[in-house]
Amino acid sequence: MISMKYRDLRDFLSLLEQRGELKRISQPIDPYLEMTEIADRTLRAGGPALLFENPKGYSMPVLCNLFGTAKRVAMGMGQEDVSALRDVGKLLAFLKEPDPPKGFRDLFDKLPKFKQVLNMPTKRLNSAPCQEQVWQGEDVDLSRIPVMHCWPEDAAPLVSWGLTITRGPHKERQNLGIYRQQVLGKNKLIMRWLSHRGGALDYQEWCEAHPGERFPVAVALGADPATILAAVTPVPDTLSEYAFAGLLRGHKTEVVKCLSNDLEVPASAEIVLEGYIEQGDMAPEGPYGDHTGYYNEIDNFPVFTVTHITQRQDAIYHSTYTGRPPDEPAVMGVALNEVFVPILQKQFPEIVDFYLPPEGCSYRLAVVTIKKQYAGHAKRVMMGVWSFLRQFMYTKFVIVCDDDINARDWNDVIWAITTRMDPSRDTVLIENTPIDYLDFASPVSGLGSKMGLDATNKWPAETPREWGRPIKMDEDVRARIDALWDELAIFSDKDAKR
């Protein structure tokens, strides 16, 4: 599966630069708003990753738009193109529910997958590049880092690509998650994690098991691409993100123990923030412009106190912005969509395709095409999408179509909705379900409704009426006209080029 390997972020950047996928910007650019505007224009044009070498007021370069195209997401996962991410999804589906070999030949066919599993354990180092420079105590100062202030009405600079590492009580496995963090002071950040996310669950369990005790936290900035992408990929609960990163990378993830706690961080990370959350220490976070295209409301979240900053020599700060799609999370969603498909198909073989349109904020609307086998089949698939993977817990709309519809073509999907649906019969509404806290359209924060649209052809049990047959030209006629088409010269060469 692996075709490209990177030991660290710098290794990846070198390859991107060789391929014209990285642009160095030497002009002084301000992290306050200017970087966002440049990054946004570049991403919308399908441009390269950006390395701002001279941020105004800082000596540390800033990396933006690293995963600003689906191709670069695929490259970060060790693949040459997005279509190959289906193989990543197949591997995850296998790891989620491995099928035992049915015989010697089947065992032989599965050997490559078993060999990849050998790369899953982490490799622990005694020293690491991420600890080449150390600040602690009074020397800790987050203002040394050129944290971007992305939008005019944002409350403060925002750490956007922090890989947060936590461990719940009595757990061996660490959790890795990407949570935005508002800069609150020279040694304090606000950790905005939603209650169902791994870091928040670890913290809740810690508070129950160790009342009053500080909760250890580490945040890695600028990890290698495999580790970053593993943190946003739907890995099985039994598999750690570090282990999956090893599979993607083709060799074990190298980690090192923090200086102030027992958490293990990526050894090659550019910057690591170590510290703790004091139980009950909360602060109002926001407002911030987010991936919906709006500023979100203010809410209280835990305060992360930083006791140590460690970093590499000549560290690079990895950052991004979020806004109305397309933004970097939306682009990543398009690529990771290919990972989801095989996982869903293993559980629901009738699924032909699954698509999360980026304009739907990457997860709020899903289009599913199926090989329909019985009356009510579409409703079963809706319920399956909402319940099978927690990544779709916040998906508000699920549209189910037949397999003659292209899930990724709105012309097809809208035609199916308007010709195969009766709004009363074919719409499913479910109230009081979990909803994204950023969704201000829901009547209650974190709680709202979901809608399923059955845009499939209806079976006799679903309607007493004779169902329409799609118009289709005779194949012999199509073949004759294909052969005659160029001779007809209906379009001139000039018109054809248009």
Swiss-Prot record:
Cofactor(s) the protein requires to work: prenylated FMN; Mn(2+)
Q: Which SUPFAM superfamilies match?
A: FMN-binding split barrel, UbiD C-terminal domain-like
In which pathway does this enzyme or protein participate? Cofactor biosynthesis; ubiquinone biosynthesis
Instruction: Write down a Pfam family by its short name.
Output: UbiD
How this chain assembles, per its entry, is: Homohexamer.
- Which parts of the sequence bind prenylated FMN? I178, Y179, R180, R192, W193, L194, R197, G198
Reactions this protein catalyses: a 4-hydroxy-3-(all-trans-polyprenyl)benzoate + H(+) = a 2-(all-trans-polyprenyl)phenol + CO2
Q: Which GO terms describe its molecular function?
A: 3-octaprenyl-4-hydroxybenzoate carboxy-lyase activity; metal ion binding
Coarse class of the primary localization is membrane
Keywords, sorted A to Z: Cell membrane, Decarboxylase, Flavoprotein, FMN, Lyase, Manganese, Membrane, Metal-binding, Ubiquinone biosynthesis
Q: Which Gene3D superfamilies match?
A: Single helix bin, UbiD C-terminal domain-like
- Tell me which positions the record assigns to the signal sequence: none
Q: What is this protein called in UniProt?
A: 3-octaprenyl-4-hydroxybenzoate carboxy-lyase
- Where is Mn(2+) annotated to bind? N175, E241
Its function, per the record, reads: Catalyzes the decarboxylation of 3-octaprenyl-4-hydroxy benzoate to 2-octaprenylphenol, an intermediate step in ubiquinone biosynthesis.
Q: How the protein sits in the membrane?
A: Peripheral membrane protein
State where the protein is found.
Answer: Cell membrane
Cofactor note as given: Binds 1 prenylated FMN per subunit.
Q: Look up and give the organism this protein is from.
A: Yersinia pseudotuberculosis serotype I (strain IP32953)
Q: Which GO terms describe its biological process?
A: ubiquinone biosynthetic process
